[in-house]
Amino acid sequence: MALRMWASSTANALKLSSSASKSHLLPAFSISRCFSSVLEGLKYANSHEWVKHEGSVATIGITDHAQDHLGEVVFVELPEANSSVSKEKSFGAVESVKATSEILSPISGEVIEVNTKLTESPGLINSSPYEDGWMIKVKPSSPAELEALMGPKEYTKFCEEEDAAH
């Protein structure tokens, strides 16, 4: 019993979380420093979007850090399928109880799928930013743009420095 309590308090202090329910989608554990989760296997933009590249498809959403700063998301505006997105250009908006923010595309390409669940349940961005709260799936037009994005360690450091400056 004492060991279980110690393990639980240690996990809480380190902000370790298990994603056993969807282990086929994400790494078994993610480490959260201070404020939000940053996952291995994803790329990150300095505008706080993430990209998961699998084969010829890149899934895009906003990071846990971004949704945490936005607060409760109440409305999402997304592009239509078969439209194009351009790197560092707006493809939609997220309205929260705090503000409305444009969402910038971290890469260029053709939108092949839009997460229509967000129309009825925009809060999925808060509860599951890396799984159920994804926004669009894109066929990338420039693989070099993916390589230019930050990895998890770089993004964590970027967020820490950005938060320290504010």
From Swiss-Prot:
Identify the domain of life: Eukaryota
Q: Cofactor(s) for this protein? A: (R)-lipoate
Chain positions found as Phosphoserine: 141
The reply to whether Transit peptide figures as a keyword in the UniProt entry is yes
One BP term from GO: glycine decarboxylation via glycine cleavage system
Q: Where does it reside?
A: Mitochondrion
Q: How is it modified after translation?
A: S-nitrosylated and/or glutathionylated at unknown positions in response to nitric oxide.
**Where's the Lipoyl-binding domain?**
57-139
Record note on cofactor: Binds 1 lipoyl cofactor covalently.
Q: Which residues carry this modification: N6-lipoyllysine?
A: 98
What protein family is recorded? Answer: Belongs to the GcvH family.
Question: What does this protein's UniProt record list under function?
Answer: The glycine decarboxylase (GDC) or glycine cleavage system catalyzes the degradation of glycine. The H protein shuttles the methylamine group of glycine from the P protein to the T protein.
> How does the annotation summarize its subunit structure?
The glycine cleavage system is composed of four proteins: P, T, L and H.
What name appears for this protein in its UniProt entry? Glycine cleavage system H protein 3, mitochondrial
